[in-house]
């Protein structure tokens, strides 16, 4: 009997030890896992518009990161925040990302970059598509940006003026051109100056038509029709780009030829001249990688956009009974037939 009792105690002791060891090991695993997650680099993404509006560009951004080994949830954590075309929300969501203690903050567009700049002077910021970063005071210079911001930039005035020139080349008789703008865009002043001089050189009259939000775009086209515009040009503004489909539809309904961003021609607009934005978003990963590996943003030169594309939509030209000069078609990077 004593032998039986003694063996029972021994068995229970072993089971207790095994069970206790398992619980102990499991308990050690969870903190280790949590700790490894906490060590993953944190990337904050500040979007001035919507994720749906970003489309292929956000895919390019993720692809660029993936090529360098950064996969959301596995080797990094990405926090996305979207202002949904409401620039007034940018300071709030920029502060929200700062409060998450991200290691690097990614912005697109000048309004988003400015909001991030005001929210933090210590967290590195990578701007993806800010217009004239030096002229707007975001960085000191392209080669030595200073502060906590680096990334890519392009010059909105020159791009928009080029659209006006292409429109004139495609439609030599055009006289009165509406310029569809978001007046809240920080690039508006220098762009208007460049557009005025370009319109004068091309012997065209320029009319400024404003739309701050997507709900104002339809009214903008009503104004174009009332003022007798022959054609229109779109400012390089994120809100307007994201609403390219509606703009193209309204242009078709009013039989107005227009020139704008790449997205505009893709969804039915006549002419597009634009920066290859997908390339810029993909390049953002290079800046992020350098910063996460210890390089200060002030020591990383700002890159200027160098890849541009001209697109002609011949389907739209046919619908508008327009004949596009062969010389322009031959120079186009893409022709939609």
Where do the language-model regions lie?
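Short hydrophobic alpha-helices and adjacent helix-cap/hinge residues
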Residues: 1-337
């Amino acid at each position: 009997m004593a032998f039986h009792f003694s063996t029972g105690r021994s068995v229970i002791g072993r089971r207790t030890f095994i069970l206790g060891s398992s619980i102990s090991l499991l308990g050690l695993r969870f903190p280790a896992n949590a700790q490894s997650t906490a060590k993953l680099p944190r990337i904050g993404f500040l979007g001035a518009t919507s994720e749906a509006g970003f489309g292929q560009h956000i895919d390019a951004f993720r692809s660029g990161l993936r090529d360098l080994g950064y996969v959301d949830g596995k080797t990094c954590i990405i926090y996305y925040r979207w202002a949904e075309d409401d620039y007034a929300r940018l300071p709030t969501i920029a502060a929200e990302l700062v409060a998450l203690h991200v290691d690097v903050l990614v912005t697109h567009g000048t309004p988003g970059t400015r909001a991030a700049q005001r929210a933090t002077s210590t967290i590195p910021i990578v701007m993806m598509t800010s217009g004239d970063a030096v002229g707007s005071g975001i960085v000191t210079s392209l080669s030595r940006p200073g502060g906590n911001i680096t990334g890519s930039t392009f010059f909105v005035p020159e791009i928009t003026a080029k659209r006006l020139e292409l429109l004139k080349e495609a439609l030599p008789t055009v006289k009165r051109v509406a310029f569809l703008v978001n007046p809240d865009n920080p690039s508006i002043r220098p762009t208007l100056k460049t557009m005025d001089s370009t319109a004068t050189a091309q012997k065209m009259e320029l009319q400024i038509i404003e739309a701050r939000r997507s709900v104002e775009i339809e009214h903008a086209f009503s104004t174009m029709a009332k003022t007798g515009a022959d054609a229109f040009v779109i400012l390089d503004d994120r809100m307007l780009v994201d609403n390219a489909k509606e703009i193209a539809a309204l242009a078709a309904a009013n039989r107005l030829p227009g020139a704008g961003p790449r997205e505009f021609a893709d969804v039915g607009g006549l002419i597009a001249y634009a920066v290859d934005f997908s390339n810029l978003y993909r390049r953002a990963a290079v800046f992020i990688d350098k910063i996460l590996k210890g390089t200060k943003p002030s020591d990383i030169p700002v890159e200027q956009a160098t890849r541009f594309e001209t697109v002609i939509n011949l389907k739209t030209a046919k619908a508008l009974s327009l004949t596009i000069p062969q010389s322009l078609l031959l120079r186009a990077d893409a022709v939609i037939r």
